[in-house]
From Swiss-Prot:
Keyword Acyltransferase among UniProt keywords: no
Family as reported in the entry's similarity comment: Belongs to the CRISP family.
Name used for this protein in its record: Cysteine-rich venom protein VAR9
GO CC terms in record: extracellular region
InterPro entries assigned: CAP_dom, CAP_sf
Maturation and modification: Contains 8 disulfide bonds.
Organism of derivation: Varanus varius (Lace monitor lizard)
Pfam families (UniProt xref): CAP
Span of domain SCP: 41-80
Task performed by this protein: Blocks ryanodine receptors, and potassium channels.
Residues in the signal sequence: 1-19
UniProt KW keywords: Calcium channel impairing toxin, Disulfide bond, Ion channel impairing toxin, Neurotoxin, Potassium channel impairing toxin, Secreted, Signal, Toxin
Amino acid sequence: MILLKLYLTLAAILCQSRGMTSLDLDDLMTTNPEIQNEIINKHNDLRRTVDPPAKNMLKMSWDNIIAESAKRAALRCNYKEHTSIAERTIGGCGVWEKILSC
C-alpha cells in the first residue's frame, strides 16, 4: 500500500513539474533513467540549499542495487528498520531506510 501512495504522490509531483495534463504511469517508473535523473537532480538541488552549507557534501547518484534494496524494504512494510549491519551495508556503503507509514 505504501508503494502505491508513494508512486501516486511521485506521479502527481512529476506531472506538475513537467506540465503534463494526463498521467502515463509507465513514464514515471523509477526504472526509467529520465525519472532517476530527475529524482537525483532534485535531491542534489535541495541538498545544495542547506543552511549552513555542508562541508564536503558528496553528490548523490542513482544505484540500482540500493534501489532494489529500498523496494524490498517497502514491499515488506513491517514498520521496522533493519537492525543488522549486514542488512544496512550494500557494496561497502552504509544505507538506512525508514518506512514511516503503510
